[in-house]
A protein has these predicted regions:
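Bacterial Sec-dependent N-terminal signal peptides
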Residues: 1-37
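Mixed-charge, low-complexity segments
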Residues: 14, 24-34, 72-73, 85, ...
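Secondary-structure boundary elements
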Residues: 38-134, 138
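Active-site rim recognition segments
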Residues: 56, 113-116, 126, 180-258
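Generic detector of well-ordered alpha-helical segments enriched in charged/polar residues
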Residues: 79-86, 97-100, 104, 129, ...
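Hydrophobic/aromatic-rich core segments of domains that either
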Residues: 101, 141-212
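Alpha-helical transition-metal enzyme core signature, strongest for iron centers
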Residues: 103, 139, 143, 355, ...
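Short glycine/serine- and small hydrophobic-enriched flexible loop segments
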Residues: 105, 148, 329-332
Length: 417
């Protein structure tokens, strides 16, 4: 009996491109600049641009002092910075405050970079290390770093995509901030707005804690999440209500069980999350240009995530098929030697059980691909046939062992004649 040689398979290649900003926002609809009506207003207050001279000095807390005293070496990685903070601070509240302080004071806003969509499959670890090394970034970088530090400290956190209203008008670009679960309750943090402001294309440091640990409804006066779930409200505001500052009391809105939705969101993969986000956005009322842009971006990311999911399943199936082939070939070589030197029965059985388990996983992975673009179907079908071939071979050897173990030990050698 000869070994079943491993067949070569061309790896399915899918070129995935990270999406950048799809549409410029230099010219905005005049509707964005409507001031809030006084009747039934949601109290969307203006956040005026402030200079260091116009802000009352803040009284530093103990967590602030700990953050400001962090040695340079501690800020070289997420783990080392959180380890330093935990040497001096113990509660979620203290750690969240110190992290906000450190990020807002140590990261400089990069005025030469604009908002771009982050690839859902991007390597966050590399991005965060780049931020820590360069000590500069934009809102995405502030939010990503804050989230990473908070999660390292043991709290749940999310980066939130959205847009802003200031001085009665919508700001022209998307923005990112964070939600963190501090001491069992969700709060909002915007370390970018806590770092300073941009004037005449220059970043003016103006560290403050006005956007540190705010209740969701408080930050909702100026920050509108694209995903209604991140309002953390049973009655989310529609985009139009936020844009105008007027709550439509006649608008029929079913109770939104955001906590259950968030729990499901935490369990979803990238594709499932994107699909559910898009559905929630579409159900949240009339869109403005920014929301429309994000809907288009999300639709594109859904397509990319779908391709990536196919690629991941294919590569997993191919890897498992290869391992199963190697494992069953090892058994074949041992069988060709008439089980010499003799191994314990359990060890011999495992030589077939292992490839069987591997090929079953490969079969599950390849069959998880329900639909695929036409150009990917041929390699998928080819791999499926190869998996079936290995599975058949494994089953034949499994039947052989079943008969082998039924015989008395002295008669087993006859199985190899």
């Amino acid at each position: 009996m000869t070994s079943m040689f491993r067949q070569s398979t061309n790896r399915l290649t899918v070129w995935l491109f990270a999406l950048c900003l799809l549409f410029p926002f230099s010219k905005l609809s005049s509707a964005w600049r409507n001031t809030a009506t006084q009747d039934k207003a949601f109290s969307i207050s203006a956040v005026s641009k402030a200079s260091p001279d116009s802000i009352m000095p803040e009284r530093l807390t103990f967590p602030d002092s700990v953050a400001l005293a962090a040695p340079e070496a501690a800020g070289r990685s997420v783990s080392s910075l959180v380890a330093y903070l935990k040497q001096h601070l113990s509660t979620d509240d203290q750690l969240a405050r110190a992290i906000y302080t450190w990020v807002s004071r140590n990261i400089k806003y990069n005025v030469y970079i604009t908002y771009t969509s982050r690839n859902e499959e991007a390597d966050e670890t590399k991005e965060i290390q780049k931020i820590l090394s360069e000590r500069k970034g934009i809102c995405q970088d502030y939010a990503l770093l804050f989230k990473a530090l908070v999660k390292e400290a043991g709290m749940d956190a999310y980066v939130i995509d959205g847009y802003n209203r200031r001085d009665g008008a919508l700001l022209p670009d998307p923005h990112e901030w964070c939600a963190a679960k501090v001491s069992g309750k969700w709060y909002m943090f915007d370390p970018t707005w806590g770092a300073g402001f941009v004037e005449n294309y220059q970043f003016i440091p103006s560290p403050n804690h006005r956007f540190c640990k705010l209740l969701p409804d408080t930050l909702l006066k100026t920050h509108m999440p694209f995903d209604p779930m991140f309002q953390f409200r049973e009655r989310p505001l529609s985009y139009e209500e936020f844009d105008t500052g007027v709550v439509d009391e006649q608008r029929s809105v079913p109770v939104f069980y955001w906590a259950d939705t968030l729990a499901l969101y935490a369990r979803q993969d990238t594709l499932e999350r994107l699909v559910s986000v898009r559905q929630r956005m579409l159900s949240n009322g009339r869109s403005n240009d920014l929301v429309y842009y994000m809907l288009e971006l999300t639709s594109n990311n859904i397509r990319i995530a779908g391709y990536q999911k196919i690629l991941n399943a294919y590569n997993m199936a191919m890897d498992l098929q290869g391992k199963a082939t190697d494992a069953i070939n090892e058994f074949v070589r041992y069988r060709n030697k008439a089980f010499e030197p003799l191994k314990p029965d359990a060890e011999i059985q495992a030589m077939v059980d292992v490839p069987e388990e591997l090929i079953n996983r490969a079969d599950s992975a390849i069959n998880s691909i329900r639909t695929a673009p036409e150009r990917y179907r041929e390699p998928i079908l080819k791999l499926r046939d190869q998996i079936m071939e290995v599975a058949t071979t494994v089953y034949k050897h499994k039947l052989f062992l079943r008969q082998y173990f039924k015989l008395p030990v002295k008669q087993r050698k006859g199985m190899f004649k």
